Regions:
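Short, glycine/serine-rich, charged loops/turns that create anion-binding
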Residues: 12, 88, 132
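Polyanion-binding loop/helix "lid" in catalytic or ligand-binding cores
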Residues: 1, 60-119, 129, 145-193
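Ligand-binding beta-strand-loop-alpha-helix segment within the catalytic cores
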Residues: 1-83
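Short acidic, glycine/serine/threonine-rich loops at helix termini
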Residues: 16-23, 94-98, 136-141
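Short, flexible segments with low predicted structural confidence
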Residues: 45-49, 87-89, 139, 149-150
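Active-site pocket-lining segment
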Residues: 124-141
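A structural signal for isolated positions on well-ordered beta-strands in alpha/beta enzyme cores
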Residues: 6-8, 126, 188
Length: 193
């Protein structure tokens, strides 16, 4: 089956008062020595020590509010194009009057995907990852793969810290957000295999 593919740079509005700006937590960039980390701090950047690896910059990871190119995405889909949008979570921007300003932040790509799927009134959100199934107690001798879970169970597992913050947690949070956003909506987290 042949279909044309369009890629679209996607600007995503975030709230300047999102708590994530007060508590930067998303690790970015290379690992640094203590001296390099001090220079970064002197520039006004946030730095976090990563045990056994050194130091790394951290920036805000606010929640997406609105995808500005939504009309363009819909038009391309109506033209039967395969649309690649919101790559890497999109470009975080702040609304300032009638202008947009880039935000020093990153947006979790899975959360942006849920926002986009909801905005497009999709029925299913498919999140691909490196494992076939979400698991409880991942990487331990009591690891339990899950075939399915309800929004209530997923929320309970999130509150129990069952999912790694850098890997599975954003996917499960996005799945819960999307599945909760309308009747009959489902989220699937699996590998491409």
């Amino acid at each position: 089956i042949y279909k044309p593919v369009s890629t679209l740079i996607t600007q995503v509005r975030v709230d300047p008062f999102d708590a994530a700006f007060s508590y930067p937590s998303k690790e970015i960039g290379r690992f640094m020595t203590e001296a390099e980390a001090k220079k970064e701090k002197d520039k006004g950047n946030h730095v976090k020590e990563i045990p056994g690896k050194g130091y790394q910059r951290v920036i805000a990871a606010p929640r997406p509010i609105e995808i500005y190119e939504l009309d363009a995405i819909k038009a391309l889909m109506d033209a039967e194009q395969i649309v690649i949008a919101a790559g890497g979570g999109g470009i975080p921007v702040l609304q300032q009057g009638t202008r947009l300003k880039g935000a020093s932040a990153v947006i979790e790509k899975d959360v942006t995907s849920a926002c986009l799927a909801e905005s497009l009134d999709a029925d299913i959100l498919l999140l691909l990852t490196g494992v076939e199934k979400v698991a409880l107690n991942y990487g331990t001798s009591t690891e339990t793969p899950l075939d399915a879970m309800s929004v209530e169970d997923a929320t309970k597992y999130i509150n129990e810290n069952q999912f790694s913050s850098g890997a599975m947690l954003p996917k499960v949070e996005a799945a819960v957000s999307f599945a909760s956003s309308g009747n009959g909506r489902k989220s699937i987290i699996t590998s491409i295999d």
